[in-house]
Amino acid sequence: MKMTRRAFVKANAAASAAAVAGITLPASAANLIASSDQTKITWDKAPCRFCGTGCSVLVGTQNGKVVATQGDPEAPVNKGLNCIKGYFLSKIMYGQDRLTQPLLRMKDGKYHKDGEFTPVSWDVAFDTMAEKWKASLEKKGPTSVGMFGSGQWTVMEGYAAAKMMKAGFRSNNIDPNARHCMASAVVGFMRAFGIDEPMGCYDDFENADAFVLWGSNMAEMHPVLWTRITDRRLSHPHVRVNVLSTYYHRSFELADHGYIFNPQSDLAIANFIANYIIENDAVNWDFVNKHTNFTQADTDIGYGLRDDDPLQKAAKNPNSGKLTSISFEEYKKSVAPYTVEKASEISGVEKEKLIELAKQYADPNTKVMSLWTMGMNQHTRGVWMNNLVYNIHLLTGKIATPGNSPFSLTGQPSACGTAREVGTFAHRLPADMVVANPKHRQIAEKIWKLPEGTIPPKPGFHAVLQDRMLNDGVLNCYWVQCNNNMQAGPNINTERLPGYRNPENFIVVSDPYPTATAQAADLILPTAMWIEKEGAYGNAERRTQAWYQQVGTVGDAKSDLWQVMEFSKRFKMEEVWPEELLAKAPQYRGKTMYDMLFKNGQVDKFPLEEARELNDDSHHFGFYVQKGLFEEYATFGRGHGHDLAPYDVYHTVRGLRWPVVDGKETQWRFKEGSDPYAKAGSGWDFYGNADGKAKIISAPYEAPPEVPDSEFDLWLCTGRVLEHWHTGTMTRRVPELYKAVPDAVCYMHPEDAKARNVRRGEEVVIANKRGEVRVRVETRGRNRPPKGLVFVPFFDARILINKLILDATDPLSKQTDFKKCPVKITKVA
């Protein structure tokens, strides 16, 4: 590649941006900018490996290794910018403890539950797995096997895994770690609109007059999108930024209005805003009358705990998602109790501030963008909160037009594209279909060439239930891919670790590194990372992006896709299907599950010649695997509002936002003129619902399952920091990021620290009924909790803070609440 003046300017711009951000570029990147080595580096595009923003990066490879990355200036998402994690993407694959071969617990030369991890071949690994799976299937049937996947799976990996589980093993016991982050958003979308994923797009950032962050610290969790809000705010003086949270963080630095509310009281605030809109005649009646219906949610629905838990037994309508049609007058009556006085009393937010927030929503001339992520979704009433925010936008008609957008942000690179769109949840199928719907199962069975009745109608075990079933010995063979749930999930000591170490169970973990989850497993499989394989992700604005494999894997690591497909070869159809199904499909007798799933004339229809020379998976299987899987998967959504472009197109663009119809992407869904599925003359068409109308759903404030008391007198909130991503599996192996933030700390109000005779930097014990951890106290810095609350990030494997979290979930979405549980803090003597 010749070093043109344009390339030189771009390269130096990257260096300048890094310097401004306080970043020292890796030596390889510095050489790229300063020396003739530039000519030896090959560049290609790929979406970033981290969050759900979907930034595109340019990846520089040399001698079979990634040596540099930089922001992609052609990308509409990030326009050449990266966050600090993105600047160091080149180092995530090269940690010193990268796993390079399968490791099986062995003793005296054979597998043993309490044995030491011993290197084995892939054949030994898969033979051992298959032996365990076959024994479990024969003894207990399909519900005894399960899989826990990821919003970091590529589209093809998630699709292959879901197909293997639901069509091959006939088990719906597959769930992604997106259950912990996006499940409440999914259910909220489905209840209100009958279809999943945001109606808006990132272009809304340049059009909104007011931004409202509901429990989201975008400055650290979505920093590139935060730059777009910052630019809009600083270049347009009329724009206002509102930040609601249970503690102060970096997003407050830009906020015109900051609101610190009591945990769980966001429900009361949202209902107050709806009441304010009604009482101040700010309802957009033309929109409401034409495009909405009013419904009432069942209340007192419990907390997703075990059935014998006293809180669950006390609930009047445990786990009920029933909606009852009501009139506007009934809806008005339901929100009337949420006066500003009542909302202020519950939330702790001053009345004047609440009114200021409500006015911005009520003003017909103010375009409002509401944004949220884990603060709203990781909530025992997360689905309700999603719907209460939609209510506000629907009452005012501020939806699906530029700058008017209720926008759920995602935390993982393909939580949308893989977990949600592919349907790797225990209850879902691709394109918003569900296993409980006979018509949906019939569609899937037709596309997958399955006999009727193959896919079980009952949803499988969701993430938290998988832990309980492992613990109880109901789920016995379990495969974890592309996540670190032993560190990320709740209530580790009581529910998760006992299930992993249950002698009846066989646990397999596929990961590039020896995580806490891997170390609790029986078999560890080394996994290819990011651009060591070809794949596709789908980001928060419905943008699907693809990339080519650009380097070989480290050691004998294999992609999750390769592992799923290769494992499926170990099973004859007679070993996984009953005779009644084989009688309906005699062509599968004597065939392997691999033959049925992947050599079906669809997945294997694209010849190897169409793939690039560097495509390990395709060369192993003898056909263009990624294209075949993608095109079969895309069949589900085309013509049904989830249209994807042909696979090859995605390699020529920086992503496209579905539905893609006649070669054109969709920016705003449901809006006539923008969405090809919106009927002519409709204005708005919420076509996910049969009547084309969105639901305004009434739901009240309800208290959390646990609150502080005299013994456990502080709230604990867990979350992330800018420099690390989730459990730190990748970022803690990047020296620059590790040095920047080497340890998790307990952010605490100075007065709470003083009351416990604790000084900044001293070690304390945080404890509750579920366990305890040791951590240093921080009373200054970026996160400043109010009195009565502490914040501890969960990236640090030495401080497994999430073991203190109760495994309470939203009863509708089954998503865990990581944002509030009572603890006590004592100084270490």
Curated annotation (Swiss-Prot):
Belongs to the prokaryotic molybdopterin-containing oxidoreductase family. NasA/NapA/NarB subfamily. Keywords: 4Fe-4S, Electron transport, Iron, Iron-sulfur, Metal-binding, Molybdenum, Nitrate assimilation, Oxidoreductase, Periplasm, Signal, Transport. The lineage of its organism: Bacteria, Pseudomonadati, Pseudomonadota, Gammaproteobacteria, Vibrionales. Catalytic subunit of the periplasmic nitrate reductase complex NapAB. Receives electrons from NapB and catalyzes the reduction of nitrate to nitrite. One of its GO terms (molecular function) is iron ion binding. Transmembrane segments: none annotated. This is Periplasmic nitrate reductase. Substrate binds at residue 794. Its EC number is 1.9.6.1. HAMAP family: Nitrate_reduct_NapA. Its cofactor is [4Fe-4S] cluster; Mo-bis(molybdopterin guanine dinucleotide). It comes from Vibrio parahaemolyticus serotype O3:K6 (strain RIMD 2210633). GO terms for biological process: cellular respiration; Mo-molybdopterin cofactor biosynthetic process; nitrate assimilation.
